[in-house]
Amino acid sequence: MDIRKSQFEENIWYLLFIYSEIAAALWVHIFFFEITLRDFIDTKLQRRYKRLDWWNQPGLLSKREFLQIQRVLNRSNIDELKYQVRTLLPLSFWVALLTKRYFTKVWLNLHLDSLCDGRENFHLRANEILALRNLIAHHREISSRNLIRDHAYLGELTAILDPELAREVEKRSRVLDLLLNARLVGSGGGI
């Protein structure tokens, strides 16, 4: 009985190591997607509104998003124009700017429609990535997710924003090899 228990525990530890490696490999993709998305939106809105502090454009942001920026600025005690505020805002802020509420004020100014299959699909996929990011960041279980789909979404969205960067990230990625290894182990998860 002790032998079975130790074998069972060994299998559990092995799966935990595989999934932690997959999470680490996915984090590289998430990192590049997050910085690419925030830089892309920030740059486009700076150009559109001809100001570094585009969030102060009257009527642009909802009260919630505006207060989120104000909290970040107050907490950081910085001069908002001398610092890149975009680096302090969470991915959830940038994904919120892709919602239907911001269709005219943000989405149309990003000029992404010709590059992707619409705001709704882009937002849906970005929201899936946000959920995956939060699971990984909080050391939660990811084995029940469709990780192949998540990996594809990361590649697709990053390629829309910066095709060259997406190719470089994919060239160095270990995600698919790790996912294949996890499948061979027969984890029974959502891979």
Annotate each predicted stretch with a short phrase.
Residues 1-191:
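Amphipathic alpha-helical interface elements
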